[in-house]
């Protein structure tokens, strides 16, 4: 049957998510998930009816949390669907292109390739910042520029002045898509305030990380109302199941927000603990991280990754030579991981 698939799909290499890669163990620090398993009321009614395309209570709650108007907010099945919607809505197949800056999140490329949209890359600089001159030289045919901050997998923040320069550079030419999946761990670095000034800005958000709802698959796109209305033309008629909308709305309640804030503080403290501990091991380079993960360069990254895997500590290998990404888990998980790495290099 594969021969019946589109040629581009036949050639496609699927994104290898943490779950696809698999593994067995009791310490899972490979998918940037939260260690907190929060409880929600699940006495759902109305499951015999379709959900609203954009549930009003959920949209209102997230808009209030993000500091935007409900008309500037769209919810979808994770931020991944937001990526796909933007490409489908704004890029002509075999005509337009997207641009992204590796090393970064892999789904920008996969979504574009699946739809038949050209992918242009301008690698990040040595300190993992935007190469603005390189981007400007490659903007021909580009409709969307994806920027992840905090960047996955490197963990760093993209300089605000560079984001503004990029928005100015792409005015009336392309949309800058800021992937803020991890911004809840450093909300002061958000670009949401720039929406009022730049109509060519779209922001991706998720409840998977700081809100501990990776299994719920609930994301958001923030943008000006005109852009949101374009996305509403291509989104599925019932993208958010009733249970998803109700649990997400609970997570965004006053009590839910207070809990998320406390858990973010806890995870940021665990990140600092892990960063200091790893930095004290000779031969390791620990990069500053602003999300719920750290990128670490080892003398022999692939060997360390494999040894940890075989010991039941599941980390995430990286396209960056000898680098491994470590999610920030519970204090117990961080202690076990740190202890294993110390012993490995002792």
UniProtKB/Swiss-Prot annotation:
Signal peptide: none annotated. Keywords: Amino-acid biosynthesis, Aminotransferase, Histidine biosynthesis, Pyridoxal phosphate, Transferase. It catalyses: L-histidinol phosphate + 2-oxoglutarate = 3-(imidazol-4-yl)-2-oxopropyl phosphate + L-glutamate. The gene is hisC. The modification N6-(pyridoxal phosphate)lysine is found at residue 209. Its cofactor is pyridoxal 5'-phosphate. Pfam families: Aminotran_1_2. GO terms for molecular function: histidinol-phosphate transaminase activity; pyridoxal phosphate binding. One of its GO terms (biological process) is L-histidine biosynthetic process. This is Histidinol-phosphate aminotransferase. The keyword Thylakoid does not apply. It comes from Vibrio vulnificus (strain CMCP6). It comes from the Bacteria. PROSITE patterns: AA_TRANSFER_CLASS_2 (PS00599). Its EC number is 2.6.1.9. Pathway: Amino-acid biosynthesis; L-histidine biosynthesis; L-histidine from 5-phospho-alpha-D-ribose 1-diphosphate: step 7/9.
